Design a protein with these regions (language model features):
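Short aromatic-enriched loop/helix-cap "lid" or pocket-rim segments at secondary-structure transitions
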Residues: 42-45, 98-100, 259-260
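Active-site/ligand-binding neighborhood in enzyme catalytic cores
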Residues: 90-94, 101-244, 255
Length: 286
């Protein structure tokens, strides 16, 4: 490993960008990834039907920071793309994050107006809140609405992803998708929302295209790396490594699950190709 100044474990977005930054500072960089492809969870490919597929689920690049979008624009052309999502509840489609349209979808006009009025009165300067906040609200109408969403969506969806019962869900997980207090649609509210014109793999290839970067795939890095805590050394292939090690993988694996395994949510992908122009009301429906 004497030939390298930096070893980066993981060739996802963080690993690729860090490698590029070091390479531009004239550092020799080696990237290891256990997968047989670059791009991490952003990896995409064209399938046998000519469809560009995001192998690990849909990914939209989004940020509020102009300088970040300017940076990624050095490595790819981008097309504006505002992601919209929805949910099927009791056989009816409604947008997510849930908004005032959701109230209209599941309550009669009189009750819907009462709930929306209560929300406006209780949250005059707020655009959204978490379901946890609404579940604990003193107003009965607001609390009832939150209970409906929790019972029919949040608890089921989250429990399925994390593989636990609704009662075992960590409250912090329920804060990820807020409830909106307006009719706004769109999953993100960031100014910059884009998809690469070509593909994410093309974007990653351009980031990694540098004479100071070497990529090795199908490598179990943790089989070759040892953290010598007694001597405060990094040991690679039984030799001390005096360079920089950047690790972007699962933190519990790095420490050999010394403090137990961390919980991770998971998905099972089933690929089906339909011979129709449009299959559902939004790009993502849960």
């Amino acid at each position: 490993m004497e030939n390298y100044d930096v070893i980066v474990v993981g060739c996802g977005l963080s690993g690729a960008v860090i490698a590029r930054q070091y390479a531009e500072k004239k550092k020799k960089v080696l990237i290891w990834d256990r997968r047989k492809h670059i791009g991490g969870n952003m990896y995409d490919y064209v399938n046998e039907h000519g469809i560009l597929v995001h192998m690990y689920g849909p990914h939209t690049f989004h940020t509020k920071k102009k300088q970040l979008f300017e940076y990624v624009s050095k490595f790819a052309e981008w097309e504006k793309y505002n992601l919209t999502c929805g949910a099927q509840i009791n056989g009816k489609y409604t947008p997510t994050p849930f908004n005032f349209q959701t109230i209209d979808d599941f309550y009669d006009e009189k009750k819907a107006n009462m709930i929306k009025t209560a929300i406006k009165e209780e949250y005059p300067d707020r655009k959204f809140a978490t379901v946890l906040e609404l579940l604990n609200h003193k107003n009965n109408l607001i609390r009832e609405y939150a209970q409906f969403l929790f019972k029919n969506d949040y608890s089921l969806y989250t429990a399925k992803q994390w593989g636990v019962s609704p009662e075992e869900i960590d409250p912090s997980v329920l804060k990820r998708v807020p409830i909106r207090f307006n009719y706004d649609v769109g999953y993100f509210d960031d100014e910059y929302q884009y998809m690469p014109t070509n593909s994410y793999v093309n974007f990653f290839n351009n980031i990694l295209n540098h004479s100071n970067i070497t990529v090795e795939l199908g490598v179990e890095a943790l089989d070759r790396i040892h953290l010598d805590e007694d001597n405060k050394e990094i040991v690679i292939d039984n030799n001390r490594f005096d360079g920089i090690l950047v690790y972007t993988g699962a933190i519990d694996e790095l420490f050999k699950n010394k403090y137990g395994k961390l919980p991770y949510r998971s998905l099972e992908f089933k690929w089906v190709t339909e011979e129709k122009k449009s299959f559902q009301q939004a790009p993502v429906v849960a």
